[in-house]
UniProtKB/Swiss-Prot annotation:
Family: Belongs to the frog skin active peptide (FSAP) family. Brevinin subfamily.
Biological processes per GO annotation: defense response to fungus; defense response to Gram-negative bacterium; defense response to Gram-positive bacterium; killing of cells of another organism
Major subcellular location class: secreted
A Pfam family reported for this protein in Swiss-Prot or TrEMBL: FSAP_sig_propep
Expressing tissues: Expressed by the skin glands.
GO terms under cellular component: extracellular region
Compartment annotation: Secreted
Superkingdom field: Eukaryota
Protein purpose: Has antimicrobial activity against Gram-positive bacteria and fungi but has weak or no activity against a range of Gram-negative bacteria except P.faecalis. Active against the Gram-positive bacteria E.faecium 091299 (MIC=19 uM), E.faecalis 981 (MIC=19 uM), S.aureus ATCC 25923 (MIC=1.2 uM), S.carnosus KHS (MIC=4.8 uM), B.licheniformis X39 (MIC=2.4 uM) and R.rhodochrous X15 (MIC=1.2 uM). Active against the Gram-negative bacterium P.faecalis X29 (MIC=4.8 uM), is virtually inactive against E.coli ATCC 25922 (MIC=150 uM) and inactive against P.aeruginosa and S.typhi.
Keywords: Amphibian defense peptide, Antibiotic, Antimicrobial, Cleavage on pair of basic residues, Cytolysis, Disulfide bond, Fungicide, Hemolysis, Secreted, Signal
Protein name: Brevinin-1HN1
Removed propeptide positions: 23-45
Position of the signal peptide: 1-22
Amino acid sequence: MFTSKKPLLLLFFLGTINLSLCEQERDADEEERRDDPDERDVEVEKRFLPLIASLAANFVPKIFCKITKKC
């Protein structure tokens, strides 16, 4: 029974180390984002431009169809 606990303990230990390293990197990234407002603008553009483009792609053909009545 002890032999089956060793690998589990090792996996748990390695997992906690990975999580702590990821948290440190995430905290560092958040600090950098707070410092640079231009990056925030870029992130906002990345979020909203695809949304606007997809909405336009859906509605422009419908509007064009209604205007020209060639549906």
